[in-house]
C-alpha cells in the first residue's frame, strides 16, 4: 500500500515548538520545506495541511492543531474525509524507547505508552498504520518522562535528532512508493 498521509505528532503553540515531544512535527515540517510546500491552517480539519508529490506519489502532510493526546481526532477526520485507509498513513513521532538520534520505521503494533499513538489507535479503531519513530532517549525513570518530553533537548541531542530527521526524510520517497520492506532495511540498519 502506498502512503497518502503523513502526520507529524506535536503539541501546538510556541511554548512546545522546540520540545522533544514535537520531533515528529520537526520532520514533517522539514519535509515540506525541502519540497517548497507551505502549510495552511484548516480549522475544519483541525490541522495545518499541505501536499507534496515525490516521483508521482502525491501525499498530504499534516500537523495537528490538537494537543498530542488528541492526535487521533485530527487523523480520523482527515483520513475519513479523503478516504485514506489506516495502512496508507504514516505517523511520525518521538520515541522514548530509542536512543537519541536513532530512527526506526515499523508497521502496526501497540502504542507503547505514547498518548498520541494511543488516541490514534482508538480513533482509527486499529493500530495497523505505519510509524516513523524518532529516538529522543529516556530520562531514566518513569516519573521524569512528562517533564522530559516537554523540555528542550540539549544542543548535542538536538543535532542528533536533526541527523535522524535527515535520515528519515531520505527514505520518504521509498515509503511513498509503498516499498516498506526496503525503507525499513535502509533506515533500521
Curated annotation (Swiss-Prot):
The keyword Hydrolase applies. PROSITE patterns: PEPT_TRNA_HYDROL_2. GO terms for biological process: protein quality control for misfolded or incompletely synthesized proteins; rescue of stalled ribosome. Monomer. It comes from Legionella pneumophila subsp. pneumophila (strain Philadelphia 1 / ATCC 33152 / DSM 7513). The active site is at residue 21. The gene is pth. TRNA binds at residues 16, 67, 69, 115. It is found in: Cytoplasm. Belongs to the PTH family. This is Peptidyl-tRNA hydrolase. It catalyses: an N-acyl-L-alpha-aminoacyl-tRNA + H2O = an N-acyl-L-amino acid + a tRNA + H(+). Keywords: Cytoplasm, Hydrolase, RNA-binding, tRNA-binding. SUPFAM superfamilies: Peptidyl-tRNA hydrolase-like. Its main location: cytoplasm. The record marks 11 as: Discriminates between blocked and unblocked aminoacyl-tRNA. InterPro entries: Pept_tRNA_hydro, Pept_tRNA_hydro_CS, Pept_tRNA_hydro_sf.
